[in-house]
From Swiss-Prot:
Protein name: Natriuretic peptides B
Segments of skewed composition (Polar residues): 77-89
Key words, A-Z: Disulfide bond, Hormone, Secreted, Signal, Vasoactive
GO cellular component: extracellular region; protein-containing complex
Keyword field contains Signal: yes
Organism: Mus musculus
Length: 121
């Protein structure tokens, strides 16, 4: 073979190896070591877990501090939410106007669509 031809083929082969994406970044399957991307993801997951635990502890301390400082305020707010939850059950529903027949008005009152308006007393 011609020396010039062999030299040009070797240069092309080395250039191909240099530019190939599998150059030095290949990781065998099932290797005990982690890839850099997996390592970064593990670090991020650990950081997120730590932050969420810190936030949960802060919220718990805040809630405990709130109940120690203002127990009456908390009880009032709980009582008002109870009243709000009980109101629709105890109130009477009356029809203000009727645009369509009785069956359509009943469907409109359930879906709250149409011209049938409900008034809570």
């Amino acid at each position: 073979m011609d020396l010039l031809k062999v030299l040009s083929q070797m240069i092309l082969f080395l250039l191909f190896l240099y530019l190939s994406p599998l150059g030095g970044h290949s990781y065998p399957l099932g290797s005990p070591s982690q890839s850099p991307e997996q390592f970064k993801m593990q670090k991020l997951l650990e950081l997120i877990r730590e932050k969420s635990e810190e936030m949960a502890q802060r919220q718990l301390l805040k809630d405990q501090g709130l109940t120690k400082e203002h127990p009456k305020r908390v009880l009032r707010s709980q009582g008002s939410t109870l009243r709000v939850q009980q109101r629709p059950q105890n109130s009477k529903v009356t029809h203000i106007s009727s645009c369509f027949g009785h069956k359509i008005d009943r469907i409109g009152s359930v879906s709250r669509l149409g011209c049938n308006a409900l008034k809570l007393l």
